């Protein structure tokens, strides 16, 4: 059984056998008079009548329900049917190889999107471009009712030359009053009644917005960058390519960033009918625009995600740290009577300690990293290093220099505040692309406090990385030192020993020569942060005692009656 007029797969299967497609159903799914006693019945709804007829004729072998995929209306959820109609098409099947070759020049993020698009191109069919609607761009094709000649009109100017007089508004219904003379039989030609698929409009946007102006096209076409959801692989991305190849012989974009879909908390597609839509305004009203932007920016390219209020709260905490950091800079400046943005690096750099060298190295490493990521259009990877940078500024650098910035020598204070201000401002310039509202509010506060020159954070140029300030060894050493400090603070917490209480010594045990070198280099920082009078390094800690604590919940079920003996032995050995 095959129904070439009832679906694309059946139609393709019948083509080699020259079986013509047909489908007598009306637009509303009713059978016509030509079908005899079944006239007036409706497809799908009246299926039982056909089954009863087969049963009456004693030709029904079996009646049963079979589960299979079937198209349904996205709005009312009722089944829909395929129905063959006459349409206008773009002939694109012979463009496939050309499109595949041109696509190799396009930068896709992620790579999976590129592979999906290539697969789509390989299976590309001639594309239907006409629709039977009222709203839409009228199909600019005139047909002669006598000889059947067809003429495609390419512009308003051409139509006016053919028709003599045309209406100001070229949409329906006014356009249908325009007649032109057939070049073959001299009889009137009328416009075909269809409108153009809206995706054709979208596909021509890349040059329509330039008014087809040669100079603008040379300057702005093709587009450097476009971005849309992955479902646009077969829609906008496809039509952008098709119409561009047909008209200009080349692609209309150079780089594509593809993002995934946002589902509800339980992983379902959001739908008004299901009542599970999370409005962006709900999120904005609760936490602000920047939280929504930073939350969305962290999503891996091309991956679907389930919405999470907890992750939004995490972004709130991060942005709060950033906000508090700029307030701290203002307070430090007032307490020390130092204007950090008036300081020149040439004056203060000779007083840079390892903390300043580390923080400035981290800044320029991140500038270089983020600039490269932006150039490669890997937008989802930009936010993490920027957030790490301002969190390190707040939780690492400021903690390390807090005492020095208030009680140190004047030159030390200036070095601290210069570094603090420089790192904060450069970070804000970059993070502004993600969280522009908080960055602008911070900048206006800094501008008022320190009389900064630019009117807005957005008026600043993108930072440039200074390779001379990047010191990987210092960064790696400080990273390890911070891990040691974190481990020491954890040990204090386990021992329920507050940080205010000094300890005689902090013992760092490791067989790593790298750790030994870091402990030696960053000894003062480690001892200060751990409030330890002495830092001791040892490859082995002979005076340490290891205690083995049996996990009764695991031993009991696994060993049954042997559990008491095993527990006793473990306790004895430790």
Locations of the language-model features?
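A short glycine/serine-rich beta->alpha loop
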Residues: 220-232
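Alpha-helix C-terminal capping segments
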Residues: 15-18, 208-211, 245-248
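Short, solvent-exposed helix-loop connector elements
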Residues: 108-113, 303-311
